[in-house]
A protein has these predicted regions:
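A glycine-rich, hydrophobic loop/mini-helix early in the fold
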Residues: 74-100
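Mid-length scaffold segments of soluble, non-membrane domains
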Residues: 86, 95-163
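C-terminal motif of bacterial Sec signal peptides marking the signal peptidase cleavage site
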Residues: 28-29
Length: 245
């Protein structure tokens, strides 16, 4: 039963993130020491927000995440992640339709129905076991497919790296298309949103340690990794376009 929690898709996604981070290390090592970056005209402001986010992580969110992982059994933790991934599929489906990826949208719609029923509201990722892989689409990628440029790099308080174009995802995917925002009971809504954020932060703690060990300038490293990751996602994993982006 435990294999329903630790899926092939989750492993492959984590592997992609590590690959992107390693590529960013090589790109960062080849970069000049010049602070001029056309992608980041707000660097002074962004570095301030980055420092604020790091402080909040160190003082509040990392301790909470560590406690969450310490007291939560692995299968429960994975089930919680699966539950929120299942809700995220609704946003993914909407963006796939907007990008005219109707085959993927149909697959993910079937995935959502199966996981929501057989998978007990998504706690078990039954669909991946059936060959219905999870896809990752958001409104920022949709705008990119429609021809919108990335715009300047922006570090968002509490959320981290983004671009002007990708800020739309916070409004559309995390707001309008997020079913949790339509829950009428405020305590239930707040509890789910908080758990979602804690789950999100806890999943990237190991990545944060890797960044700290691999880079002299964490801010620059994360910025480069962000743009590489977004290029990879926008091109649906097309390695040629991804590297050439």
């Amino acid at each position: 039963m435990l294999h329903l929690f630790i899926t092939k898709e989750r492993f492959e996604y984590n592997l992609k993130i590590i690959t992107i981070l390693l590529l960013s290390i090589s790109l960062y090592g080849c970069a000049t020491t010049s602070s001029l970056d056309e992608r980041d005209p707000l660097e002074g402001f962004n570095r301030g927000v980055y420092s604020f986010n790091q402080t909040m992580d160190d003082l509040i969110f990392d301790p909470i995440g560590n406690l969450y992982r310490a007291i939560t059994p692995d299968f429960i933790e994975s089930g919680v992640t699966n539950f929120f991934n299942n809700l995220d599929d609704l946003s993914v489906i909407a963006n796939e339709i907007l990008q005219f990826k109707f085959g993927r949208a149909s697959s993910d719609a079937a995935r959502f129905v199966i996981n929501s029923t057989v998978g007990l509201l998504g706690f078990f990722d039954v669909s991946s076991e059936m060959g219905l892989s999870k896809h990752n689409e958001d409104f920022g990628q949709t705008l990119a497919q429609w021809g919108f440029e990335s715009g300047p790099y922006i570090v968002v308080p509490f959320f981290g790296p983004a671009s002007l174009r990708d800020l739309s995802s916070l409004v559309v995917d995390k707001g309008v298309l997020n079913p949790m925002f339509y829950i009428e009971d405020d305590m239930t809504k707040s509890g789910l949103l908080t758990l979602n954020y804690v789950d999100f932060k806890s999943r990237f703690s190991s990545t944060k340690e890797l960044v700290g060990a691999a880079s002299l300038d964490e801010y620059e490293f994360i910025k480069n990794a962000y743009f590489e990751k977004r290029a990879y996602e926008i091109n649906d994993g097309n390695v040629v376009d991804f590297i050439g982006e």
